[in-house]
Amino acid sequence: MGAIWRDGKDPMGLGQASGRGTLMTTLGIELLDAGEDWLRGRMPVDERTHQPFGLLHGGASVALAETLASWAGTCAVDADKVCVGQEINANHVRPVREGWVYGVATPEALGRTSQVWSIRITDEAGKLVCISRMTLAVVPARRD
């Protein structure tokens, strides 16, 4: 399979430029690198992403998963289209107290009107923390 990125879209550049002033920056999510069909990012496990018992909040993991899948999906469609979330699920399999978690989004299906992405989130030791799957709708980009 060749690179899935369309119309010269760069997932790294688009995500870094468009993420300012969003949940992405509030949670400290960073895009790290991209391959031909994957996007990788990380998020700190700290007071911004903890639940009351000092562990990584499951919702923060889902925010990381959705961020990665949405950016990757939008870069895998024509310039006049964007991707928006329709459904996301997550299984939280290991707690994390501090450090960083890393997510990698890879496509399961890239259709004309919808996409399905898998996102694996691991801790700094590479142990699985969360596995997520997201469905995106492919819609016309707003030009206003």
Language-model segments: which ranges?
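Terminal targeting signals and extreme-terminal segments of soluble enzymes
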Residues: M1-D144
